[in-house]
Amino acid sequence: MTEAMKITLSTQPADARWGEKATYSINNDGITLHLNGADDLGLIQRAARKIDGLGIKHVQLSGEGWDADRCWAFWQGYKAPKGTRKVEWPDLDDAQRQELDNRLMIIDWVRDTINAPAEELGPSQLAQRAVDLISNVAGDRVTYRITKGEDLRDQGYMGLHTVGRGSERSPVLLALDYNPTGDKEAPVYACLVGKGITFDSGGYSIKQTAFMDSMKSDMGGAATVTGALAFAITRGLNKRVKLFLCCADNLISGNAFKLGDIITYRNGKKVEVMNTDAEGRLVLADGLIDASAQKPELIIDAATLTGAAKTALGNDYHALFSFDDALAGRLLESAAQENEPFWRLPLAEFHRSQLPSNFAELNNTGSAAYPAGASTAAGFLSHFVENYKQGWLHIDCSATYRKAPVEQWSAGATGLGVRTIANLLTA
């Protein structure tokens, strides 16, 4: 590999010859990033994206001013799904270097897992990768159970089984227990539930190509909560947390579920399927029932659930929904501390009743009369959370994946949200 390009930081503006808007300049010693104090982390990330665009694949972060957050901002912009890159990191104190190394290990795992093609990453592979990551950081403090295929039906996981039965690759439920207490009877502090749809064709409510071409990333919620648990463990999480990943393909076949089918869940709820492309909520319902049964203080589910959230927020924010104002405030405070983008969207009691069905208690999608799709999706999920008004957060992961590069990000997964959830778990 070529000699490293030195990247230094300066609080002085660039020479006037570079223009008044210049955020970096080039000299004989390398490249200098000119920080202005307004959005230094964003400036570093955008500059790193430009440096990668120049074809520079080996850099050395040099000089004063670098800390773990600034190094991480550079890497977020510099990393891309194609090619190899090498960064020589600056000298950091032990705590900051450990924090940076943990981000590189875990959040890069999240990005790489979401970017993996569906042919490589099916439901079973996703579950096993999650087990491997958590076991790597937690060792013998972890136990897990994987339930798949017809065993799901036999055990009453009808949402997950129904959605996944149309694929040759069996649907899978991962139930993982991180218990650092050593006490098998220790209370469960939190449950994390992730949507793990490893490819979403839309089923018989089939997607157009322009909406299907990124659907390998529809397991982004599962990857995010897995990464969050792993990252929280590296930050010293000392409470019992359970992880439920609901993993399946949503495909078309002679055995696939159909419009008008009715699913009966273990909590007695009957759901009429009127859109097979609203499958994420059907699989999450099974995970939320299991999570509620643990009686935890906190339930967080994460899912690339609706296009409506992306319409509202683009790919710039994750959408947050909760009936618990205090808990939502804590999550937003964690997001601010970690410099990650979350935005709260409305969720009210009336959203729970905006899913009418002529044949069942619930419809899996709102009608044209109720167009607040992200809020009605959250309302649907609330029917499967035993105490939905307290201790439950729903994250619609609209910032998980970008179909095209922008000034701060390459195309593909971002890893956003991992640090925020981990922060909340360890607060």
Curated annotation (Swiss-Prot):
One Pfam match: Peptidase_M17
One cellular-component annotation, GO: cytoplasm
Example GO BP: proteolysis
Residues that coordinate or bind Mn(2+) 1: 200, 277, 279
Entry note: cofactor: Binds 2 manganese ions per subunit.
InterPro entries reported in the protein's UniProt record: Leucine_aapep/pepB, M17_PepB-like_N, Pept_M17_PepB, Peptidase_M17_C
Keyword tRNA processing: no
Compartment(s) of residence: Cytoplasm
Enzyme Commission designation: 3.4.11.23
Superkingdom: Bacteria
NCBIfam families: PRK05015.1
Assembly: Homohexamer.
Function: Probably plays an important role in intracellular peptide degradation.
UniProt similarity note: Belongs to the peptidase M17 family.
Name of the protein in question: Peptidase B
